[in-house]
Amino acid sequence: MLYQIHTAPLARKAEIDLPASKSLSNRALILKALSGGRGSLSHLSDSDDTHVMQAAFDGDHTLVDIGAAGTSMRFLTAYYASTPGAEVTLTGSERMKQRPIAILVDALRSLGADIRYTEAEGFPPLHICGKQLRGGALTIDGSTSSQYISALLMIAPTLTDGLTLHLTGQITSRPYIDMTLSMMRRFGAQCAMEGPVITVSPRAYVPADLSVESDWSAASYWYELLALCHYGKVASGLQDGALNEAASVLQDKVFSKTSGSQDFALSEVTLLGLHPDSLQGDSRVSEYFAELGIATRFTDRGAVLSATDQPLPTEVCWNLAGQPDLAQTLIVTCCALDVRFRISGLHTLRIKETDRITALQTELRRLGFVVGAEGDDVMYWNGERCESQCPVVISTYHDHRMALAFAPMALCLHHDALYVDDPGVVSKSYPSYWDHLRQIGLSVSEAKL
């Protein structure tokens, strides 16, 4: 399926009922299961990832297919391995079978787990025979996926000897580890983190009632939309194939400001269910976009975003090691706003739903932006441009965040449509996204080329 997105007169103000956080939802489901299935969870995410997790706990299964849900693969691997009597084969999509899991499996085996690979060594599918694990001390590379670490932490109270986890090197996505520990405490766990050492005592979880807050990752696309409405450039297209070598000449001849146009009247967005004291690391999106002219204030209903008149920076330098899921949003936004950037902390992007570094470079080139990369950790843009494609068709690579981050670029194509391939991929985290874009006035419809 292909969607075409056209600019249209937009609402001046919008109120968006964001999806619940899938990061919090998935942790809550695991912790509820480890608590004996008791307690009440409300406002769970409606995402594919969370549905997969719920289905895994719905009855007895000998085969669990988690599709493209990486979080579910990591969390359920640890859960089943530590559940006496469980016997299950855990599999997923073809892409999932290419995503490494050896670090987690090796760690669980060192704790006594019975896990074997059924196809390629080091990758799903996995055959797991659950048993009581002994626990003890474990050392793991802190720069690995935080989901491995969170998976181990959540089962730690059920281990005979608890768990002392030593993290070596740079710790990746620390906010997600903090989120996991905080939620474990809500379910009665005794855990502490001092420097690179996390200690979890053996102690039975207790049931908890929990309402999941809205998703800050989903909020990032509304920051992007508002920034593009207020500051973005509207491209007339390079249909004649002529290339402007100087960025200033290109900006004058090819781009015009959107601000003030009736087609781009969106000036305030209220995002329901967001809190300033969030457990989610991606809540820092408000700080990043404050540098890009978008202010945030909080009411008892959520976050209210509004555009300011502050000048945009010529260049930004950010480290997203704690918020890698914001990379696509921020990189696409900076290109659209003509803000040069150097962004580090991206070393987990190549093993996400797709190789996000390569995917970003490829799709931004379709829009006329030449973005560089240094190894697996850094992406940068120095203002270099190339001939854009017409029409612009964005490939999503089975990655929800590619569709979510690139769709707002429709605001930057003047009267031309932006096309998004496989738009249904957004159901992985934000199923109502296209309806919400229509709600503010964008034209989103099926198309054929």
Task: Please state what every model-predicted region is.
Residues M1-L449:
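Short, structured segments at the rim of ligand-binding sites
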